[in-house]
Amino acid sequence: MTADVKSAAARILSTDSSRDPSFNNFSFTPFLRKSFGFGLASDVPVCKAYSEGHCPLGPACPDRHPTPSRVTTSTTTASGLAPSTTHGSLVCKHFLKGLCKKGLKCEYLHEYNLRRMPECQSFSRSGYCPNGDDCLYQHVREQARLPPCENYDQGFCELGPLCSKRHVRRRLCKYYLAGFCPEGKACPDAHPRWSENLPKPTMRVEKTEEELERERALIREEQEREKEREREWRSERGRGGGFMRGRYRGRGRG
């Protein structure tokens, strides 16, 4: 038995994984390559569309989609801009209207995905949007802005509904608990981080009716100021057009 262990160890140590591609392959390797592009050979070319901002094929693209940390040389687009890492998760508002002229060079996504739309400014300020359900932007509730409760994510929070943080009801991922989940961050189930030094949960502070009314009054005042600024801008624009209209009479005679 000892001889078998020694021979197996010697065989593993003497194996060159770079020459034997099947040495580090697992049963889930094809899934990772197809879904996330992990493990692609270095001789596979980098996707040109992805390097310019966005690839419509996504994970199904046969070429490599390197992350910014893996890129050794700074690739730039024709406009002189590097592929965006901050706007690449937001949908282009001009594309939704059919008015984007950048095409594949646009720093934003060209797809119909409401979950990746920017946040609605009107709803975020006042909790009300005049477009309602027809609005193309995200309506983020105040409760959704709270950070998740670490104690609840690990199974139990002693404060329950009185906790000042958000309690997200998700079942634990059985694959993550077993050691590895092939879905990674895209997994719909919870991947809790176990820690012994979690902060103690705090009580949620309920606002009084006077405080809520004061906030509503401030929001109404801000909306009125915005409407006033818009009216002034339109009136200035109208006066400018009227001022220039009719001034030019052409070249005079003689």
Curated annotation (Swiss-Prot):
Compartments, as annotated in UniProt: Nucleus
Pfam families: zf-CCCH (PF00642)
Protein's name according to its UniProt entry: mRNA 3'-end-processing protein yth1
Compositional bias per record (Low complexity), positions renumbered to this chain: 68-84
Keywords: Metal-binding, mRNA processing, Nucleus, Repeat, RNA-binding, Zinc, Zinc-finger
Role according to the record: Component of the cleavage factor I (CF I) involved in pre-mRNA 3'-end processing.
Keyword Iron-sulfur listed: no
Location of the region described as Disordered in the Swiss-Prot/TrEMBL record: 65-84, 198-254
Keyword RNA-binding attributed: yes
Residue spans of biased composition, Basic and acidic residues class: 203-239
GO MF term list: RNA binding; zinc ion binding
